[in-house]
């Protein structure tokens, strides 16, 4: 007959092992994914509205913008997704600021990666 200390040790070990097994399986189990999908599906999808362009386009430029079908779309993936659509006139007006912003963001990420290595 095993001693009471051995029985208690085995019982404690089996309880800890069961807790560890349940913690790992609950995170990876398909049931957990289904619960997450239900929680996400209850939220209505967010609809983004573009900002008003009041004052950004001068009245003399409106004929040029209406006739221009050229649109520029910039997309890149970093730790987050970014997408920007601009007409030709908007790109001409805000292109330098946009370029500087993108350069600052991308170089900052590159500097952080180099510092981590």
From Swiss-Prot:
Modified residues (Leucine amide): 98
One GO CC annotation: extracellular space
Compartments it resides in: Secreted
Signal sequence bounds: 1-23
O-decanoyl serine: lipidated positions: 26
Induction info: 2.5-fold increase in plasma level of ghrelin upon fasting.
Gene Ontology process terms (BP): dendrite development; gastric acid secretion; negative regulation of inflammatory response; negative regulation of insulin secretion; positive regulation of cytosolic calcium ion concentration; positive regulation of growth hormone secretion; positive regulation of insulin secretion; positive regulation of response to food
Tagged with keyword Secreted: yes
Region described as Disordered: spans on this chain: 29-52
Biased composition (Basic and acidic residues): 31-43
Lipid attachment in record (O-hexanoyl serine): 26
Sites of O-octanoyl serine lipidation: 26
Coiled coil: none
Gene name as annotated: GHRL
Recorded family membership: Belongs to the motilin family.
PTM per Swiss-Prot/TrEMBL: O-octanoylated by GOAT/MBOAT4. O-octanoylation or O-decanoylation is essential for ghrelin activity. The O-decanoylated forms Ghrelin-27-C10 and Ghrelin-28-C10 differ in the length of the carbon backbone of the carboxylic acid bound to Ser-26. A small fraction of ghrelin, ghrelin-27-C10:1, ghrelin-27-C10:2, ghrelin-28-C8:1, ghrelin-28-C10:1, and ghrelin-28-C10:2, may be modified with singly or doubly unsaturated carboxylic acids. Amidation of Leu-98 is essential for obestatin activity.
Protein name: Appetite-regulating hormone
């Amino acid at each position: 007959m095993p001693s009471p200390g051995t029985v208690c040790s085995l019982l404690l070990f089996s309880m800890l092992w069961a807790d560890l097994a349940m913690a790992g399986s609950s995170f990876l189990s398909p049931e957990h994914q289904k619960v997450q999908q239900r929680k996400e599906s209850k939220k209505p999808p967010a609809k983004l509205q573009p900002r008003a362009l009041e004052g950004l386009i001068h009245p003399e430029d409106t004929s040029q913008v209406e006739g221009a079908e050229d649109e520029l779309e910039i997309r890149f993936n970093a730790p987050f997704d970014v997408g920007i659509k601009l007409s030709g006139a908007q790109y001409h007006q805000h292109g330098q600021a946009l370029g500087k912003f993108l350069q600052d963001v991308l170089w900052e990420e590159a500097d952080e990666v180099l510092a981590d290595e």
